[in-house]
């Protein structure tokens, strides 16, 4: 099972930049202002929520150094464009039991822009 997770994670690390090639990262940076109080962008810097650095291609609830809710720890998905969009639309509906105190981002274009911004940061490293 671990090998399958590793293969899927490796395959999805290429998805964000290609999938968001024509997206609006500048708007995403503005949308990130809703996240900045709880999530840092620097690797290993955890606030109320985990660092968002390197999010895409990572297994949910598996970032070293952060204590996740049971729901997130037991989640079995890899962060990609689709899971990010669904989660950010309504975190508590997508993952019941999550402790992320955020109602979600209703506008699809804002979710896409935020994902684009975060994926672009991963590409800079």
Where are the model-predicted features located?
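Sec-dependent signal peptide recognition
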Residues: 1-9
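N-terminal signal peptide c-region/cleavage motif recognized by signal peptidases
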Residues: 16-18
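Sequence/structural segment immediately N-terminal to covalent heme-attachment motifs in c-type
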Residues: 22-47, 52
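Extracytoplasmic/secreted proteins, especially bacterial periplasmic and envelope-associated proteins
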Residues: 27-30, 47, 51, 67, ...
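Sec-exported extracytoplasmic/periplasmic mature domains
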Residues: 33-43, 57, 89-93, 119-123
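Solvent-exposed helix-loop boundary motif
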Residues: 49-70, 89
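Short Fe-S-cluster ligation motifs
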Residues: 64-85
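C-terminal capping alpha-helices of c-type cytochrome domains
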Residues: 80-125
């Amino acid at each position: 099972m671990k090998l399958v997770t590793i293969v899927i994670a490796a395959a999805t690390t290429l998805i964000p930049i290609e999938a968001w090639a024509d997206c609006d990262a500048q708007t995403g940076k503005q949308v990130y202002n809703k996240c900045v109080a709880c999530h840092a962008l620097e690797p290993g810097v955890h606030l109320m929520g985990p660092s968002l650095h390197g999010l895409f291609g990572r297994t949910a609830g598996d970032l070293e150094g952060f204590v996740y809710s049971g729901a997130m720890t037991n989640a079995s998905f890899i962060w990609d464009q689709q899971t990010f969009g669904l989660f950010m639309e309504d975190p508590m509906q997508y993952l019941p039991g999550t402790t992320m105190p955020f109602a979600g981002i209703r506008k699809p274009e804002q979710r896409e822009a935020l994902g684009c911004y975060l994926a672009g940061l991963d590409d800079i490293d």
